[in-house]
Amino acid sequence: MAPATIVIDASAVIAVVTNEAHRPALIRLTEGAELISPFSLPVEVGNAFSAMFKRKRISLEKAKAAVAAYQQIAIRLTEIDLGQALDLSHRLDIYAYDAYLIACSLQFRAPLLTVDGPLRDAARRVEVKVLEVV
């Protein structure tokens, strides 16, 4: 059974909407849960697609279809404590976007769902529960 609330990051969203191998497990983990993410999620999703364009991993048409699928996922975007995020960024030596996700998990006392290894490791260093994708 999924936790009541789950913080989801762009790597997990991208894995779902681009039909990556983790997709079925990610969907199972989130069934029945409220998904939340920092306000930065749409920017991160867009950045992920632009990176895929540069690596020739996705066409514009497929990216637009994936974005349409993303827009159908019910994810509540939320503000975070920017001061706390900066503290986390400094303490954990991570980018602000990763710190936003960890701050969101701490603020809502909710586990983090990610397929990003470095983010997973940083979250665990401050005792944020990370949902495992099996």
Regions flagged by a language model, labelled:
Residues 1-5, 38, 102-134:
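Acidic, PIN/NYN-like endoribonuclease modules and their adjacent C-terminal/linker elements
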Residues 36, 76-78, 131:
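General small-molecule cofactor/ligand-binding pocket signal
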Residues 46-76, 80-82:
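Active-site-proximal, substrate-binding regions of enzyme catalytic domains
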Residues 13, 45-49, 104:
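Buried hydrophobic packing segments
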Residues 1-40, 53-64, 126:
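Short, well-structured N-terminal submotif of metal-dependent ribonuclease cores
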Residues 10, 23, 42, 46, ...:
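A general structural signal for well-ordered alpha-helical segments in protein cores
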Residues 72-118:
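Active-site neighborhoods of divalent-metal-dependent phosphate/nucleic-acid chemistry enzymes
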